[in-house]
Structures are given as structure tokens and as C-alpha cells.
Amino acid sequence: VNSNDCKKTIPLIDSSGKKVMPHMMITNMSELRAIVSHCQDYTTLMRYMDLHEIGKFVKFAHKKRMINSEPLTMTEYFTSVKDVSMIKLKTYYLEILQQLTEVQVTEMKEYFEENEEFYIGYDNVEENSQTNQTNKNAGMFITTKDAYTLTDGPTIFITKSPTTIGKFCVQQSNIPASTLDGLMETITFNTKIGKKVEKLEKSIEDKMTRNETNKDDGKSEKGSKQKESNEVKQLERELEALTSLLKTVKLDSKFMPNTLHHLNKWIVSETLRKSIDKSPSQPFKATIEESHVKSIMELANVEPLWKLLLIMGIGMFSKDVAPEYLEIMKTLAEKQHLYLIIASDDYIYGTNYQFCHGYVSKDLSNMTQEKLIQALGRVGRNNIQQNYSIRFRCPLYKKLFVKEEDKIEAVNMNRLFVSM
């Protein structure tokens, strides 16, 4: 299938691990036609229609003789193999849906409800074990058993409560209490040293600035200069001694998502293990350099939780964190060195980094359609088709496919212009 680079497939996944498609989320024919019409008006939405699911639907529609128009027969619509492209297949899918009768819609709905497949959450089980297919947290265990599903590049988790998600990531990692206590003790120790380092650096900076000012004004005498120079040197020696006290913070790689040790621990299915080995899409892992870890550990105004998460390859974008921390996170995000970024919804409009997967948190259920589209746009910004996905923790995806009559953003903009 030929594919234009800007026409991607980014499947939407619900909280149970199933793909979201227009023909699988409707209740009647009028609802279906409204959704199709909206998608035809806003063709950008086609990027969220999964090609594999489209193929299954088209095959079903032809098998059940649901093509009610001659121009929509396969031979008429696709005149040659060269005519088959990703965008044309998606357009074809919408046109078939648009011409279905009420009886056909009912038949289609019943068939796909009975034959729904899970995209994530049910292949990582031991052979011959019984699985309960009512899991409402499929794909949520991003630091343990579901990490392997996050492939090709970094993931963004958009939420109103980054700290809550951060704590969940640590909790689910199953780091032994003794190990966790030791790590937090070291991080706390380094933070205390960091505060002292910060004060010393400020003292050195102030003295050097004062020396330069006196020098420019001609007020500094030779003896005074020497004294101030000695004081600066003494402070620098104290700074060096303090810095040498900083302890190295290391975490066993089995607690770092998608390292070999981690995958060996959490992938229990031998069939899945072999499938991953053969797949061109490999589980993505962080590549955090020691210098970045050291820089974060030295920051006095960063919560221990976020220092611990960085070691795991997880960063945070939020207005609540120190600017110095945020700058390091931006550098790591730009170079795609982080496994996961937990971002507050305030960062939806200002995050231009490349992500292959995204999560939309439960606490964003009231997000507007426009803001949702902006949020989803964070994923799949690469110029190539990779293995992408957007995973919803609430049914917010329904808002994506429905025409929104009163856009809050447009109303606010109109008010702004009227008031000027």
C-alpha cells in the first residue's frame, strides 16, 4: 500500500485495549452518518482510523453484499494496484459506511461487537493460562508488563495531575521497599548537598561581581583585592569538597522500562518474546547520560520523586517544576532520550517534540474538542510511518468524531476581538 508521509495511521485505543473506529462506536444509522460526514469535512481525523480495522470492515462489507452502489465496487473504485493508497482506502471506508441501510448498520454492529479484538493487554500472558477479558486498565502498566507495547520512540502522558501519575509509575514498578528507601535516602542526601552548593555558588558569584565592580570604580586597593581573591578561592575549595560528597544514584536495570533485563522480567509469554524479536518495531528505552542524572541530583528545588523517575527514564513537563529541571527535560526530549514524559495539559500547545505514543488521562474528560485535537497532534510528528498509538483512560475519543457546534476557543476569540 502506497502511503503519503503526511497521511499516517495512529490507532486510538480505549481503556480496555480495543481499537476505536467509527463503525464500532455508533448506536444507530443517523449517528453513523453524522460521524462519517464530520470525518469527511475534517479529513485530518482519517489519521486516527486504523488501516487494519478498515481492511477487516471492507472485507466484511463485501462478503455480506453491503455495497449498494456500483461505483463503490472494488474494481470500479480502485482501477489498478497503483490506485491503492492509504488515504484512498480510508476515503473508501467512509463512503461505504455512508451508504449503509439501517438493517445493514444493525447487522454490522452485531458482528463487530461479537468479534472485537484486543490490541493491547492480552498477549503477555503465560501459555495455557486463563485471562479475564474485562480489564479496564489495559496498557496502563507502562513501567512493567505493558512497557513493551511502547515502541519506536518516546511516549507522552497528558494529565492534570503529573505527580499522581508519577507516583503510580513508581508504585507499579515493584521496586523493593529496601531498595526504594536506599534510593530516596541517597537522593535526599544529595538534595541537601545541592542546597549548600547553591548557596556557595551564589556567594562566589556575589563576591566576584563585587570585585569586578570595585575594580571598574577604582575603589579596590591591592591588599583588599588579595583578601577578596583568597576568600573566593576558599569558597571554591569548599564548593569542590561539597560536590565530591554527592553520591552516585543507580537503579537496577530490571526497573528501567524496556531494558533487556526489564523485558526478561516482565514478558512471560514465549510466543510474544519471539514475536518481539522478529518485529521491526522494537520496545523503546531511555538513554539517560550520567551527566544529566548528576545535574538533576544537584538541583535543590526538585522533588525526590522526579529525581527517582529520571533514573527510570521518565521526565515531567509542568509549570510546578524548577526552570533548571525543565530545561534539562527539554534537552532530553528533543534528543528523544526519555522513555516517557508526563505532561500537564498546560503543555499541549507548547510541546513540539516527537512522540510515538500518547496517553490521555481520566482527569481530562472535560477537555474541549479543539484542545483534544491539539493533544493528539503531539503523536506521530515524524516524517515516516512508525508504530503509533493514542490510549485513552476515559471515553473522550467520542468527542473527536462529533461536530462541536459551539467551540469555546472560537467564542473566547470573538469576545477578545469585540472588546478591542
Regions found by a protein language model. Give the residues of each.
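Conserved C-terminal RecA-like helicase domain
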Residues: 14-343, 355, 364-388, 392-396, ...
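Long, hydrophobic alpha-helical segments
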Residues: 401-420
